[in-house]
From Swiss-Prot:
It comes from Geobacillus kaustophilus (strain HTA426). This is Bacilliredoxin GK1781. Gene3D superfamilies: 6.10.250.2150, Glutaredoxin (3.40.30.10). PANTHER family: BACILLIREDOXIN BRXA (PTHR40052:SF2), UPF0403 PROTEIN YQIW-RELATED (PTHR40052). It comes from the Bacteria. GO terms for biological process: cell redox homeostasis.
Amino acid sequence: MSMAYEDYMRQLVQPMRDELVRAGFRELRTSEEVEQFMKQVEGTTFVFVNSVCGCAAGLARPAATQAVLRSEKKPDHLVTVFAGQDKEATAKMREYFVGYPPSSPSMALLKGKEVVHFIPREDIEFHSMEDVMENILAAFDKYCG
């Protein structure tokens, strides 16, 4: 891959990364960062698997950020990996999504290291932002303190 293409992709996805970081998500960009985080994690973690696709931009990211802002019950941790960009980090995080096929965008709520709620692309695409947000809020309400 050419350096110009890689630079272009970095510039293209930066606003997509920033949208989640501004909402309080911590980016995990390497498999080592994922491993280190998961090794010491306790409580609940909301994981957002980011993507460049339209349903991530128009539905998933707005639903996730609004759910985090609006929810009275919040996860202890908010983290994100970027499918297609930070491939090793995404692959490492997906190892914790036992029983769930790779999907991007997607969201997982973990209690400790176990997935207790998963929202695959199929539950995002062709749904309203409000429906996706309600799905997230219901999971926060059920599993978060």
